[in-house]
């Protein structure tokens, strides 16, 4: 089973204070770019892996999805999602993404935001997702960018008077233990090439891949984001299940 850090009371409390926890999708700087990768949702059966508070689930239903299922390992997250969701067309399920199984060809779109870098066996998950999707259906997800997850000490450093991102161990894939909101948070580092290969091996065609960084307008409104132009924090991916 994956680490369930989000049910740690201290971690959950810290997470609840993040801007994206308070403001939802509109407070997530990468959301406009991720949204652009999505197909029209009218009439689709949508599955959100690592749904958290259910922000995307509610947006998907409002955007025309016929039914939406949100899956998360955290009971605290799901309790918050249910409290915020009155719509009966949205179902929340507590499950480990490494063992969850909704049934063959039962979904028209699988979406995941910043969850798959917690999954150790993402190869197996991609293969199972391909089985859940109808032929030609889509998978859209974001993860922490491999340049962000690779270093043993993921932080900025001053070199020759300039702030730079320290990058090492990029090709050494596997678990990374970091102190983010709490000590001992375990994430999985993979290269961009590995994500591409695993998707293709699972029966997907890659449609788009984007190392997200803020645009000039976003930086104008949020000057602190300027440093994100020097190091991509998120990797956004869209793929289609082969027929």
Describe each PLM feature range.
Residues 102-109:
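A short acidic, Gly/Pro-enriched loop at the edge of an enzyme's catalytic core
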Residues 123-138:
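A short glycine-rich, Lys/Arg-flanked "PGG" loop and its adjoining helix->strand segment in the class I
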Residues 143, 147-149, 180-193:
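Acceptor-substrate binding/catalytic loop of class I
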């Amino acid at each position: 089973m994956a680490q369930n850090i989000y049910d740690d009371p201290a971690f959950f409390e810290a997470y609840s204070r993040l801007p994206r926890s308070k403001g939802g999708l509109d407070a997530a700087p990468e959301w406009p770019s991720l949204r652009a990768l999505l197909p029209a949702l009218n009439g689709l059966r949508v599955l959100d892996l690592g749904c958290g508070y259910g922000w995307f689930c509610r947006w998907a239903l409002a955007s025309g999805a016929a039914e939406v299922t949100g899956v998360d390992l955290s009971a605290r997250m799901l309790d918050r999602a249910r409290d915020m969701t009155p719509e009966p067309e949205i179902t929340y399920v507590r499950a480990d993404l490494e063992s969850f199984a909704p049934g063959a060809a039962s979904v028209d779109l699988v979406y995941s935001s910043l969850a798959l870098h917690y999954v150790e066996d993402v190869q197996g998950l991609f293969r199972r997702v391909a089985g859940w999707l109808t032929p030609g259906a889509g998978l859209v997800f974001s993860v922490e960018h491999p340049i962000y997850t690779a270093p043993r000490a993921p932080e900025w450093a001053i070199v020759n008077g300039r702030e730079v991102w320290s990058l090492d161990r990029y090709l050494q894939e596997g678990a990374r233990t970091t102190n983010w909101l709490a000590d001992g948070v375990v994430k999985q580092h993979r290269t961009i090439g590995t994500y591409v290969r695993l998707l293709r091996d699972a029966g997907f065609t890659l449609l788009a891949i984007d190392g997200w960084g803020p645009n000039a307008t976003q930086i104008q409104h949020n000057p602190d984001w300027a440093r994100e132009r020097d190091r991509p924090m998120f990797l956004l991916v869209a793929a289609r299940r082969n027929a």
